[in-house]
Structure formats: C-alpha cells, structure tokens
Amino acid sequence: MRQFKVSHPGEMIARDLEDMGVSGRRFAHNIGVTPATVSRLLAGKTALTPSLSIRIAAALGSTPEFWLRLQSNYDLRQLENQIDTSGIVLYGESNEQQQNAQEH
C-alpha cells in the first residue's frame, strides 16, 4: 500500500493566520462562522465545505476552487492510505496475467 502525507487545508490556513498574526476567533468572526468551526478546521478535524471555501477564499484572496481542490486531494490521499487495492485485478491485462492474479 502506498503512503502519502498531505496536509489538511485547515493546517495550511492555520499557518497562514499565524504568519499574519490573526487569531482563529478573529478569523471566524470575519468569515461569519463560529469559533468552534474554525477551531475544528484549523486542527484538521473537519472537512472544508464549499460554503467555508467561499468564505475563506474571500478572506485570504484566493478562490473557492483552490481550497476545495486541496480538501479533495487530502481526502483522496487519506483513503489511498487506508484502502488495500493489492487484491484487485487490473482489467486490460492479458488473460494469463489475470488468471495468475486470481489464483493467488
């Protein structure tokens, strides 16, 4: 199984806010969500939603698509680290290779 380490978008936002000297509470107030929501996001404990991505993009000068791509990439890597695909036969291989894989 392949292992990938990709940062949660919230962790990236946390670093950006720290660099700018902006607290999570202040950021939450600015984007119109609860401090608890931002706290969970910055800790990587909750996914970035489309609604949050719009608000975050407006506050940080980026696009919602950018943040959603980061979240999607993070989610995909997490699943790739959890799902064992070693027993799945690749279609399109020669019949002999498929039969050998099925026998093992």
Swiss-Prot record:
InterPro entries: Cro/C1-type_HTH, Lambda_DNA-bd_dom_sf, Toxin_antidote_HigA
UniProt protein name: Antitoxin HigA
Keywords: DNA-binding, Plasmid, Toxin-antitoxin system, Transcription, Transcription regulation
CDD domains: HTH_XRE
Site (Interaction with HigB): 3-4
Superkingdom of source: Bacteria
Keyword Transferase in record: no
Any Pfam family the entry gives: HTH_3
Quaternary assembly: Forms a complex with the mRNA interferase HigB which inhibits the mRNA interferase activity. The heterodimer dimerizes to form a HigB-(HigA)2-HigB tetramer that is able to bind to the DNA.
Endoplasmic reticulum is among the record's keywords: no
Matching SMART domains: HTH_XRE (SM00530)
